[in-house]
């Protein structure tokens, strides 16, 4: 399967960087806050309310569809606190910008952004010292960390309103084109396009 759709959508910048930058800043903050709330819910075993996160992703997508420069400039800003959340927001912004560049539909781009944002949701219940460790992990620790994919897929599969494309992104985000990834060692075209 090709990366570009058969009939790509072409997007033109509708705003300047200056016009888009301040709006993109608010969208980024909203996205980070909604992700934080969702991760707290996961951590404490509460029901997941995906609507707020989807709304925030849609706001980011609309900003990037108008002009991706604002969101891309914001990626360059660093925050010592909340690195992980900003990393996921940045990854989501890059996925949305790539979807725009490749000409995907707005629905596909929204799924790309949501999948990238939630890509590590399965780590919410792992010990933070394990996730932040600078030491080499033991085989047992590696196995524990790798289970986050299955945990995320199980959680999101039972969450209403999460598209199959989003779950595919999360299920296959650690698969490598050469088959060296995990959890299923998928190769090449066996990896869904949106997870590549």
Show which residues each predicted segment covers.
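Non-catalytic interface/linker regions that flank or bridge core catalytic/transmembrane domains
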Residues: 1-78, 82-83
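Short alpha-helical scaffolding segments that buttress acidic/His motifs in well-ordered protein cores
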Residues: 57-61, 71-75, 95, 112-116, ...
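Proline-centered turn/helix-capping motifs that create local helix->coil transitions or kinks
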Residues: 62-69, 122, 160-168
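Alpha-helical phosphate/pyrophosphate-handling elements in metalloenzyme active cores
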Residues: 81-112, 151, 185-190
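His-Asp-centered metal-binding catalytic motifs of divalent-metal-dependent phosphohydrolases/nucleases
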Residues: 91, 109-135, 152, 168-181
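Signal-transmission/dimerization alpha-helices at domain junctions
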Residues: 97-101, 124, 155-159
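Histidine/acidic-rich helix-loop-helix segments that form or flank divalent-metal centers
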Residues: 116, 156-196
